Amino acid sequence: MTADGGPDVRHGTRPEPSGDGRVVVLSGPSAVGKSTVVRCLRERVPNLHFSVSATTRAPRPGEVDGVDYHFVSPARFQQLIDEGALLEWAEIHSGLHRSGTLAAPVRAAVARGCPVLIEVDLAGARAVKKAMPEALTVFLAPPSWEDLEARLIGRGTETPEVIARRLQTARVEMAAQHDFDRVVVNSRLESACAELVSLLVGTAPDRHDTSGRTGRQTTSHPD
């Protein structure tokens, strides 16, 4: 689940049984290029299942139910929580709305042997990993802190206050990157995407180190 703002409370559900499909959980700070990388992966992995979040907020102009989000009522979302139907969920903007990752579509894709990509924030990645220990968590990192600052400021879409808040959150996220199974440095889109494709389709080394994750790092070098 890609949150629209910082979650106030993050919740998970009971562990899910493993299957044949590989599940990659992608996270990283704002402006690191997650959306661009996700688009690349969806183009290159034809049978990829990209997890679409459920949310209680109203659709924005141009958003399509089932494509951008599964838009549900607060009552229905609570029912999903009660049924244990979410891998993770969060309360956004002090409980203004809730968003979460539906377990059933992920489970079905795994059963079909399809690779699954879930894009979530740091807390969401931890919750999914707890619910699905066999999932591979991947942190998409910038080449440097200065590069991340430049990307965030260069977008020109946020106020200085919002930028400062996002950078503060990014510092926390960057400090936690070695908690992930893999770290991919997004220096160049082509290399970062190729590395993630190999993780999704199973051509990369073992999913995770059962003796204790060290956050194996792969740097996408510029040409």
Curated annotation (Swiss-Prot):
The UniProt regions of compositional bias labelled Basic and acidic residues, in chain numbering, are 7-19
List the keywords (alphabetical).
Answer: ATP-binding, Cytoplasm, Kinase, Nucleotide-binding, Transferase
Entries under PROSITE patterns matching the protein: GUANYLATE_KINASE_1, GUANYLATE_KINASE_2
InterPro entries, sorted: GK/Ca_channel_bsu, Guanylate_kin-like_dom, Guanylate_kinase, Guanylate_kinase_CS, P-loop_NTPase
User: Residue ranges under compositional bias (Polar residues)?
Assistant: 212-223
Q: Where is this region: Disordered?
A: 1-22, 204-223
Q: What's a GO cellular component annotated to this UniProt protein?
A: cytosol
Q: What reactions does this protein catalyze? A: GMP + ATP = GDP + ADP
Q: Give the protein family.
A: Belongs to the guanylate kinase family.
- Which NCBIfam families does UniProt cross-reference here? guanyl_kin
Protein name per its UniProtKB record: Guanylate kinase
Q: What species is this protein from?
A: Mycolicibacterium paratuberculosis (strain ATCC BAA-968 / K-10) (Mycobacterium paratuberculosis)
